């Protein structure tokens, strides 16, 4: 029996005016009522608005030249890699845009655009991770980094490949719609190469098994992701995420691959008439610029995995000049960062040219590339960063080559008797 209001009429929804008999449920509030149909409509409106705010604004998708110029302001050198990434990323999100617009306005003969994941080859400290991070920052999409060495095949001790997707969902604040257009960078992929070129009869759970497990999410599938990660909570509800529009950038150092490339290209030279190239001549070029898919298969990557990474590009070792540029030129250059740290204490920090050259030389000796520059800077500045904040008499710190090479103390320039530094102007 329907409830009757104070006026003798059936209760009605305050929003659509339908009576209690016309709807499944009527929820009462202080002086108002809302039906289940209006609640569903409100939910749809909210979901649409959230989807609009979470999606990339595709009409503003930057062109390849604009992407390249943005990368140029953060990453020194690696021109070929920056161009290849700019084109690949533009084409990927153009493909996503075409899919959201209904595939060429719903034409029956619409061409389905294939996914173009990226394989990025190059030595450690050459900028692979920074390139991927910078792309995600420019496009304002969620970004996650995963280490392939921590992954194992499902059912074994280690991380499942689905945990990579969980990191992306977390980066998107659990907005699955937004995560589905994000970028995932998988590092150290060369460490999951199988032990030999021939398929193994024994189970390789951290090598070939990981490559097999990655195939589906690279290609595009609806994956079930445990919200708490791992297998410790078997009864948890899974998050469904479609990886069709997730861009995967896969990177690795691939040490030893250059020998496989040289062997295929006949770099060693056999016979009287063969052209023999010197080691210096080979090293002067990008060691990975001639890579072919069969070289990667011989290295230990399975053909199906390489087939899902159609864009292959490389970064090269950074020379002394490139390391010097990295120290001072990019928007977030290391020297600028440390100058800002000292500025917050009211102290100027000056690096002489010789000091910067010595830091670059140390990074080359350690074979750590750009990643090693910060560690060297920390070693050089640790003592003065400990001392200077407690002293009010220091106006400027000068770092010379001897500070870097011989571990001598930096030059501390004091303020004058009125507390001014050497570069400060007198006030009237």
UniProtKB/Swiss-Prot annotation:
One of its GO terms (cellular component) is HslUV protease complex. ATP binds at residues 123-130. The keyword Transmembrane helix does not apply. GO terms for molecular function: ATP binding; ATP hydrolysis activity; ATP-dependent protein folding chaperone; protein dimerization activity; unfolded protein binding; zinc ion binding. Keywords: ATP-binding, Chaperone, Metal-binding, Nucleotide-binding, Zinc. SUPFAM superfamilies: Glucocorticoid receptor-like (DNA-binding domain) (SSF57716), P-loop containing nucleoside triphosphate hydrolases (SSF52540). InterPro entries: AAA+_ATPase, ATP-dep_Clp_protease_ClpX, ATPase_AAA_core, Clp_ATPase_C, Clp_protease_ATP-bd_su_ClpX, ClpX_bact, P-loop_NTPase, Znf_CppX_C4. PANTHER family: ATP-DEPENDENT CLP PROTEASE ATP-BINDING SUBUNIT CLPX-LIKE, MITOCHONDRIAL, ATP-DEPENDENT CLP PROTEASE ATP-BINDING SUBUNIT CLPX-LIKE, MITOCHONDRIAL-RELATED. Component of the ClpX-ClpP complex. Forms a hexameric ring that, in the presence of ATP, binds to fourteen ClpP subunits assembled into a disk-like structure with a central cavity, resembling the structure of eukaryotic proteasomes. ATP-dependent specificity component of the Clp protease. It directs the protease to specific substrates. Can perform chaperone functions in the absence of ClpP. Belongs to the ClpX chaperone family. NCBIfam families: clpX, PRK05342.1. This is ATP-dependent Clp protease ATP-binding subunit ClpX. It comes from Streptomyces coelicolor (strain ATCC BAA-471 / A3(2) / M145). The gene is clpX.
């Amino acid at each position: 029996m329907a409830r009757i209001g104070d006026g003798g009429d059936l209760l009605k929804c305050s929003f659509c005016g339908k009576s209690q008999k016309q709807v499944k449920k009527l929820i009462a509030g202080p002086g108002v009522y809302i039906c289940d149909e209006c609640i569903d409509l409100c939910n749809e409106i909210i979901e649409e608005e959230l989807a609009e705010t979470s999606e990339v604004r595709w009409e503003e998708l930057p062109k390849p030249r604009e992407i390249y110029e943005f990368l140029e302001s953060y990453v020194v050198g690696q021109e070929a890699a920056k161009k290849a990434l700019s084109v690949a990323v533009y084409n990927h999100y153009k493909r996503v845009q075409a899919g959201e617009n209904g595939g060429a306005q719903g034409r029956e003969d619409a061409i389905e655009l294939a996914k173009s994941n990226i394989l990025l080859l190059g030595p450690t400290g050459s900028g692979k991770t920074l390139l991927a991070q910078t792309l995600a920052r420019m496009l304002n999409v969620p970004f996650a980094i995963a280490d392939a060495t921590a992954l194992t095949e499902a059912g074994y001790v280690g991380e499942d490949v689905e945990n990579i997707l969980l990191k992306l969902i977390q980066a998107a604040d659990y907005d699955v719609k937004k995560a589905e257009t994000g970028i995932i960078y998988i590092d150290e992929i060369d460490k999951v190469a199988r032990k030999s070129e021939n398929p193994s009869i024994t189970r390789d759970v951290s090598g070939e098994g990981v490559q097999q497990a990655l195939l589906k999410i690279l290609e595009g599938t609806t994956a079930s992701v445990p919200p708490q990660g791992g297998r410790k909570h078997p009864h948890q509800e899974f998050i469904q995420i479609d990886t069709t529009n997730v861009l995967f950038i896969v990177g690795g150092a691939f040490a030893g691959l250059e020998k496989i490339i040289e062997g295929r290209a006949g770099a060693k030279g056999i016979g009287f008439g063969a052209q023999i190239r010197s080691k210096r001549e080979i090293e002067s070029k990008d060691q990975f610029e001639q890579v072919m898919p069969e070289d990667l298969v011989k290295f230990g990557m399975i053909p199906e995995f390489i087939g899902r990474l159609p864009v292959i590009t490389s970064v090269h070792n950074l020379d002394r000049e490139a390391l010097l540029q990295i120290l001072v030129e990019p928007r977030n250059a290391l020297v600028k960062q440390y100058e800002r740290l000292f500025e917050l204490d009211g102290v100027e920090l000056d690096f002489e040219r010789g000091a910067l050259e010595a830091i670059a030389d140390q990074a080359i000796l350690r074979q750590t590339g750009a990643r090693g520059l910060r560690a060297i800077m920390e070693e050089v500045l640790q003592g003065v960063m400990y001392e200077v904040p407690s002293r009010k008499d220091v106006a400027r710190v000068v770092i010379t080559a001897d500070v870097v090479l011989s571990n001598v103390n930096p030059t501390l320039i004091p303020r004058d008797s009125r507390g001014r530094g050497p570069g400060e102007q007198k006030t009237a």
